[in-house]
Amino acid sequence: MIMSQKPFDLEGYRKYITEKVREAFNVAQEARAKGLDVSDHVEIPLASDMAERIEALIGIKGIAQEIRDLSSRMSREEVSLEMSRRIAAMFKDNRKEALDKAIRVGLAILTEGILVAPLEGIADVYIGKNQDGSEYVGISYAGPIRGAGGTAQALSVLIGDVVRRELGISRFQPTEDEIERYIEEIESYDRIKHLQYMPTPDEIKLVVRNSPICIDGEGSEEEEVSGHRDMERIKTNRIRGGMCLVLCEGLVQKARKILKYTSSMHLDDWNFLANLGGKAEGKSSKKSDKFLKDIVAGRPVFSHPSRPGGFRLRYGRSRVSGLAAASLNPATMYIMGKFIAIGSQIKVELPGKAAAVTPCDTIDGPTVLLKNGDHVKINDIEKAREVYDDVVEITDAGEILIAYGDFLENNYPLPTPSFTVEWWEQYLPDGVNAKDIDQFSAVEISRKYGIPLHPYYDYYWHDISFEDLEFLVKNAEQWSITEDGMRVPYPAFDVFIRLGIEFRRSGDYLIIRDYYPLLISLGYDVRNGKIVNVKKYERKGSVMETVNYLSGLIIKPRAPTRVGSRLGRPEKAGDRKMKPMVHSLFPVESYGEARRSIIGANKNSEGSYKAEVFFYRCNSCGFETPTPVCPRCGGHCSPLGEKTGSIDLESILNRAESILGISLDSLKEFKGVKKLMSKEKVAEPIEKGILRAVHDISVNKDGTCRFDMSDIPITHFRYREIGIDERTLADLGYEVRDVNELFPQDVIIPRKAAKYLFNVSRFIDDLLVKYYNMPPFYSLESEEDLIGHLIIGLAPHTSGGVVGRIIGFSDVNAFYAHPFFHAAKRRNCDGDEDSVMLLMDGFLNFSARYLPSTRGGLMDAPLVLSVLINPDEIDKEALNVDTLSRYPVLFYEAAERHASPAEIEDTMMTMKVRIKKTGTYMGSSYTMDTSDINSGVLVSSYKTLGTMDEKINEQLGLAKKLRAVDADDVAARVISTHFLPDMYGNFRKFFSQEFRCTKCNAKYRRIPLSGRCQKCGSTSLTLTIHKGSVVKYLNETLKIAENYRLPDYLKARIDNLARTIKETFPDTEEEEKPEPREVKITGLDMY
């Protein structure tokens, strides 16, 4: 796939991608045309832009050009509403169809034709009757509407209203009972699922009473409402999750945004929205502990909200941050118990809810206190490894680098900035050397030019009290200057820790090497080797003001904003396996037993069994079979349809062995599925499953092979760090230089992914050669040969894939790609994960006919493929990524007054502004370099620690080390949000559980009176919830309660539960991992 050539420009790159996609498509089309698959054509339509994606997704021919024409002069939202009007007019003879098509097209435009929400998020659109006999429009929402996001959810209701008006249908008139039902239902849903924003009862009443459209939904939850049941116009008593999402996270939470559109379109019926959403959309710069909600055992807290010693906010963007990802020094990752790895998700206090972690070794690492009493800063990972076992306390977590664009995206007021070198350098007059600044020149430059003191010699004065400051001022004259530095008596220890001053412990003294700026800040100087007072102490308005007064210098706050955080999900990079692992989408019913073995099914059924499957009839011999080619005579078959019939598995397997030249005896395992979940019950050609078993790869629900990874961004790369040489770099169309800007569809995959995709490529080649009788497509000799080949990226909640090109490999367990690539998949980098597949695998093996017919079955399937990325058609978050090489002083001044980030967007040159001003998104930069994108912890210790006991010990042990963490609070939260709910829940379920047959997996609410499985006759029936599941956290809970200071009410809950469990299960001992215990049952012996 690699070709030697001149460097690409953007147009040449896009042309190259298009040609390679078409080349692969044509090969797959030739293979499919042979009639050996469930369809005779490639089932992933190619789309060059959003308009084509929408046309392919919704299936209305000819609308793509209309969408393009409107998009050239209207905003996305305006296009959505206008196209909805046009679609309604197109189908005006059938009002229900007009409503349905118009709303789905409008929603598809809002979601860029990528999400499945327009297909599955709207369960139904209907016309109902009001009590006065007039008609109204109802939209029934389903769970997948969540993926559309709040704004699109709300606008879909608005679209319904616009179309309703066009069709002359009246507005919805709810009854008081119906309004009360909405309130009860939403409150219940929030208790079960936790809404992002929970409206007040008055807000719910306001929306339901005034919305011209009935916001309805299908019953999505098992729980039913207790009151307001069996209502005429609400068809279910179950909680309607889709309705709750649209009303709360859509209309109420996004009320201000929706008002902009209703006002411009003079839709006065929606003016009531002005009374909503005030609390929902406002962001506050005050500290918040929301990120501490639902702490999980084993996943540590790194800092409580805004607490001294926590992560210090540093503004800027590394080449691997932005789009919600934040960067940490690799040393920080290591010192934090190795819990934070590259790609790990951390829940954060600001500006959003979470961030994926990437490395940046040009920002500050942590400051730690060692066993020998030394207080040192650790800025490189090698030093972190060296001192790791000697760390007594982590007094400062180091810096967290968060990009301006993330504050802009979240509309979060800019918090007070830390004073940093890149800010300080902009105060420096031209001609003054900014390098090699020592403690004496730092003070001299500040005095001479009237600029702030260099941040390296600035301390956390804002973290100490007046009493602390006065203690230092009072005792400074007793300190002494030596050859090693300044000797300070030990009592200053605590204050120095809070100030972040590095020192070396020597007996009863602390030795400070860079002492001069400290003395100056306290109103002292050094004369003839002696410390002398030069400014009389006088208390000012704050400690910072007093230090500025004493020093006579400008001293900026070093770290005024601290960011609380905890570990969310650990990083992920692994091949996707269905549970249990499956090689072939071929039904074995109960004959394959618990392991779903196809070979076992052949033996147990003696070669033939009945199954519900799509059948074909041979055109030559008339034999009926679930395969498109006759297993008896090899003739082509015609489709019959779905039915319950007899599968001649032995003939099918014999023919497959003959065609492929593979003996089934050589396979370690060969697994199918118990039943087919698709609408038509179409089975996959079994030859594909055999070849997957040979290459040890698993099939996904849609016939493809996937590799799942956490998403992290990258805009610039060094060729050496991605495992390629200069020749390969040039062959890929890049200039040979140290750092290159990444083309938007180029990706860097983990080496684990390379190994898996290499195996998939060999499977594809075998499939082409042995099954389709065609030449191989890949012919790879090693994993490195994957470079230059194309993949499809696909996010779980979407239905549109994006083409990418592999240009290298990383050592991390995450997926490096351009922000535009992630955004084209409707993903950001706050801990999201998604998958890739080889392009030819998708073309050759995907079929929509394999997809489950259940709600959400169309999600995570490449129903359409975007060949090229257009910045105008991707999620707008990627356009908020900033591109400057240095943030200007204007930015820092805006942050000092907590300005809205939108005020300075033009100055900050976001991708959006860059495209507007220059016509291209290429040529971007970053503020902080990273020497190697692989530098840092590669696997979180959360994944390497064995038992839960070990994880909790490490979690709480780290909490004790961190100055910014309250270990007692962490212990209490772990128990109250994880252990107790788990034990209470399993205790209740234990007494209302099902029983399971270990042979065929059949489940029973009660044990059959015969004591045998009614499906297979086995007597091996077992519990589904074991005693060990109930008591597994009990001992750990009691241990924590004994060693940490917990609230009295929590101790009482623990004591009550422990007593109940021990009375129910005498002689209880903790069972961390209970093994399923087979229960042999005969008759009523169980009782």
From Swiss-Prot:
Entry keyword Zinc: no
HAMAP family per record: DNApol_II_L_arch
Subunit structure, as described in the record: Heterodimer of a large subunit and a small subunit.
Designated name of the protein: DNA polymerase II large subunit
UniProt gene name: polC
A GO molecular-function descriptor: single-stranded DNA 3'-5' DNA exonuclease activity
The family this protein is said to belong to: Belongs to the archaeal DNA polymerase II family.
PANTHER family (alphabetical): DNA POLYMERASE II LARGE SUBUNIT (PTHR42210:SF1)
Disulfide links within the chain: none
Catalytic activity from the UniProt record: DNA(n) + a 2'-deoxyribonucleoside 5'-triphosphate = DNA(n+1) + diphosphate; Exonucleolytic cleavage in the 3'- to 5'-direction to yield nucleoside 5'-phosphates
GO aspect biological process, one term: DNA catabolic process
Keyword DNA-binding: yes
EC number of the protein: 2.7.7.7, 3.1.11.1
Superkingdom of origin: Archaea
Organism lineage string: Archaea, Methanobacteriati, Thermoplasmatota, Thermoplasmata, Thermoplasmatales
Alphabetized UniProt keyword annotations: DNA replication, DNA-binding, DNA-directed DNA polymerase, Exonuclease, Hydrolase, Multifunctional enzyme, Nuclease, Nucleotidyltransferase, Transferase
Source species: Thermoplasma acidophilum (strain ATCC 25905 / DSM 1728 / JCM 9062 / NBRC 15155 / AMRC-C165)
Function as written in the Swiss-Prot or TrEMBL entry: Possesses two activities: a DNA synthesis (polymerase) and an exonucleolytic activity that degrades single-stranded DNA in the 3'- to 5'-direction. Has a template-primer preference which is characteristic of a replicative DNA polymerase.
